[in-house]
Amino acid sequence: MNWYELYWQRITPLHLFLWPVSQLLILFQSVRRFLYRRAILTSIHLPVPIIIIDSITTDSPVKTSLIIQIANILKAAGLRPGIISRGYPDNHRPPTRVTISSHPHLTGEKSLLLTYHLRETCPVWIGYDRIETAKALLNAHKECNVLICDDGLQDLRLQRDFEAVIVDTSVINSGNGLIMPAGPLRDSFARLKHTDAVILAGHQRRIPDITDEIRTIHTRPQKEHFFNLSWPELTADAAGLAGKRIHAIVCDPDTQNFLDNLEFLKLTVTPRVFPENHHFIATDFQSDEAEIILIPEEDAVKCLSLHDDRIWVLQQEYRVDPGLREIILKKLREKFMDPKLLDILVCPLCKGSLIYKKDRLELICKADRLAYPIRDGIPVMLEDEARKLPDEEEIK
C-alpha cells in the first residue's frame, strides 16, 4: 500500500484540519447546482447527446473499461460515438486528438488506452475546456452523433443527456469517507440522487443515501487474461504462462496491486519497480533471463513503441449489468425523436447532409444514394445496414 492510499484510509490531525475545507467544497458545489437549476448560471447545450461517465472517488479502475464497453454498445446500435476527456488533471492545452502514436506524457495514459482499444472507430480528444474540446471533436468528425465525456461530473456548464456515476465500494477506494482534500470522495453520496444511474463496483451491494428511485447497475470483474503487446490478437491465461521465467515490470503507485494480482493467479515472477511516470525505453526490458515480461494495462501505452514479443499485458475487464445498455439507449431514443437533431446528422461516408424521410424512417444520402434506417428510434449509421437506392427511385 502506498502513502496516499494510506492517507485516504486514515483520519489524522491533518484530516481534521482539512475537514472544514471539505465542508466548504460541498457547500460550494451545492450552491452551483442550485444556480444552474434556476438558470442563474447558464449551461451549454451541444448539438448531439452527451453521456457523462465519472467516478465519485478520485480514481476508479472500472471507468476506462466501462467507457470502452459503452462506446462499443453505441457502435453496435449504429451510432457514431466520440470521447472527450481532460486527459490528465494538469492539462491546460487546447483541444487535441489522441492517436495511437501520441505520447502518454502529453495525453495521459488513460486517454491513450481508450484510443488503443477503440482504434480508429471512435475518436478521442482531450483538452482543458470540455466544451471547447467537444466542439473541436464535432467539427473534425462531423459523423459523430453522440459524445461520451470521460469525467465531467462536476462540470455543470456542460448539459448532459445521461449521467452515470461509478461508486467503488472497496475499502481501498472508499477510504475514510471524507470529501477531498480530506478524503478520496469528490462529492457526497447525496449527489448520487441527481444522477441517472449508479454503477456499483466492488462486493458491497448497496450504499447509503441512495433512494430506490435511482437505477443501480452492478459490475463485477471478469477473469483476468493477458494479451501480447506486439500482437494484441494473441491472448493467454495464467495457466498458459505458468512455468516460464517471468519478469514483472511496474511503476509506482501500481506496484502492490499488480503483484498481488499476479500472486493470486499463482504466477511466480521477478519484480522490477520503476518510479511513477517513468518513460520506458528498450533497455528497461533487456534481460536474457526473462522469457515473459508482464506489465499492467496502465503501463502498456508507454511501451507501444517497443517491439518486444516477450511483453504481455495483464488486462482486467468488468462485466456490467445488461440493463445499462437499455437505459442509455432509452435516453438516446428520446433525444433522436427531435427532428432538429436528425437534421444535423451527416453521412459517415461522404460527410454530406442527409434528408430525413419520416414516412419511411430513413435518412437519405443524396450523393451516395444510400438510405440509413432509423431502427427502434436510433439512426443506424452503418454502411452495411444502409439500403442502396435504385437508379429509378427519385430523391426529393
Swiss-Prot record:
Pathway: Glycolipid biosynthesis; lipid IV(A) biosynthesis; lipid IV(A) from (3R)-3-hydroxytetradecanoyl-[acyl-carrier-protein] and UDP-N-acetyl-alpha-D-glucosamine: step 6/6. GO terms for cellular component: plasma membrane. Coiled coil: none annotated. It comes from the Bacteria. It is an enzyme of class 2 (transferase). Gene3D superfamilies: 2.20.25.10. In the N-terminal section; belongs to the LpxK family. In the C-terminal section; belongs to the UPF0434 family. This is Tetraacyldisaccharide 4'-kinase. The lineage of its organism: Bacteria, Pseudomonadati, Pseudomonadota, Betaproteobacteria, Nitrosomonadales. The gene is lpxK.
